[in-house]
Swiss-Prot record:
Amino acids binding ATP: K15, H206, I207, G208, N209, G210, D283, M284, R285, G330, I331, G332, E333, N334
Cofactor descriptive note: Mg(2+). Can also accept Mn(2+).
Keywords on record: ATP-binding, Cytoplasm, Kinase, Magnesium, Metal-binding, Nucleotide-binding, Transferase
Pfam families in the cross-refs: Acetate_kinase (PF00871)
EC numbers: 2.7.2.1
Name this polypeptide is given: Acetate kinase 1
UniProt: substrate binding residues: R89
Any GO CC annotation of this UniProt entry: cytoplasm
Organism, as annotated: Lactococcus lactis subsp. lactis (strain IL1403)
Active-site positions on this chain: D146 (proton donor/acceptor)
Gene giving rise to this polypeptide: ackA1
Record's subunit section: Homodimer.
Length: 395
């Protein structure tokens, strides 16, 4: 029996679970939310106990320090040497990494070099990996890539309609993200459908501060909403989602604060989405609390829902129908108003939601027996997938 720590760092959060392996027994788990925002929330659950604290955590490096301090303070571990493996979710693996890999100095540098494909994530991932390497030097560190699941996309889906040289010479293509989550929840949905996954057509909606949708056919990703970077696709907490690229040079020419292309990209990544439209917050909970009295918050909510509905419709066409639609991740699992708003616009497709199940259901089916497409809420478990990969690659 060994202890493995699975770490899932999002753009503004860090979710973790401590496992006893290979039994896959969860010893403790926690979540650090609102990293980089005021009043970060640190939650730790172990045994029958739960602890929650609120204080500012400015970056992912300090979040790692808080996590490890909590493990010792709460006696989840006596010594850090008990932790023999650490698995890290990394968003962008490009065309270099198509499977999970043990961290070496070369691998860490490649993760950093791929930051152009995930500017909000890979730098934070790399900072977290380095912090763990310094604090847990004897543990085997493994990187698990969000992009790996999407390597099954056909070329017609991942290529952009640009001259071929930009793909062959510069690897400009769609890579996607959240692959570990999309893979896990599609497998769980197949179980709920009672069908072999090879016979299923499933749309998975990973909706958190970052959000993406994937069309999964026969257990394989055939299209996904994020693109060359996680900036593409639906509207998100601080990200625009899809935009007309002609806006970029127009803004550079007309806004003196945006001096170059990188300035525009930074604005679209860090100051847009829910935060940019509402002017209040990147957190959906804050938007929902304000939308009945604040017109900008109301608009942000409506735009957010609109973009997700459009991608669901698109993937119903890509799959030629679907067996199931799955909601997962922070907003998808927990926000009744968001699910209700999205599903209310999909009735033409024969999707019927049971209002009572939607309000009270935290896991399982929330559609009616007559719904042509089953609708599930499935808590994602990227951490379990990560822990399994660490166990397989341990020294």
């Amino acid at each position: 029996m060994t202890k493995t720590l699975a770490v899932n760092a999002g753009s503004s959060s860090m979710k973790w679970q401590m496992y006893e392996m290979p039994e896959e027994k969860v010893l403790a788990k926690g979540l650090i939310e609102r990293i980089g925002l005021k009043d970060s929330i640190v939650t730790v659950k172990f045994g029958e106990q739960k602890e929650e604290r609120v204080f500012d955590i400015p970056n992912h490096t300090e979040a790692v320090e808080v996590l490890l301090e909590d493990l010792k303070r709460l006696k989840i571990v006596e010594e850090f040497t008990e932790i023999t493996g650490v698995g890290h979710r990394v968003v962008a693996g490009g065309e270099i990494f198509q499977k999970s890999t043990v961290v070496t100095p070369e691998v860490l540098q490649q993760v950093k070099d791929l930051s152009a494909l995930a500017p909000l994530h890979n730098p934070a991932n790399a900072a977290g990996i380095e912090a763990f390497l310094n604090l847990l030097p004897d543990a085997t560190s493994v990187v698990v890539f969000d992009t790996a699941f999407h390597t099954t996309m056909p070329e017609k889906a991942f290529r952009y309609p640009l001259p071929k040289k930009y793909y062959t010479d510069y690897a400009v293509r769609k890579y996607g993200a959240h692959g570990t989550s999309h893979m896990y929840v599609s497998q769980e949905a197949a179980k709920l459908l009672g069908k072999p996954i090879e016979e299923t057509k499933i749309i998975t909606a990973h909706i958190g501060n970052g959000a993406s949708l994937t069309a999964v056919k026969g257990g394989k990703s055939i299209d996904t909403s994020m693109g060359f970077t996680p900036l593409a696709g639906v509207m998100m907490g601080t990200r625009t989602g899809e935009m007309d690229p002609s806006v970029f040079p127009y803004l550079i020419e007309n806004d003196s604060e945006l001096k170059d292309a990188q300035g525009v990209v930074d604005m679209m990544n860090k100051e847009s989405g829910l935060y940019g439209v509402s002017g209040i917050s990147s957190d959906m909970r804050d938007i929902i609390a304000a939308k009945d009295t604040d017109t900008d918050a109301k608009l942000a909510f409506e735009m957010y829902v609109d973009r997700i509905q459009k991608f669901i419709g698109q993937y119903l066409a890509v799959l030629n129908g679907a067996d199931a639609l799955v909601f997962t991740a922070g907003i998808g699992e927990n926000s009744v108003p968001v699910r209700e708003a999205i599903l209310s616009g999909l009735t033409w497709f024969g999707i019927e939601v049971d209002p009572e199940k939607n309000v009270f259901g935290v896991e399982g089916e929330i559609s009616t027996p007559h719904s042509r497409v089953k609708v599930f809420v499935i808590p994602t478990d990227e951490e379990l997938v990560i822990a399994r990969d660490v166990e397989a690659l341990k020294k």
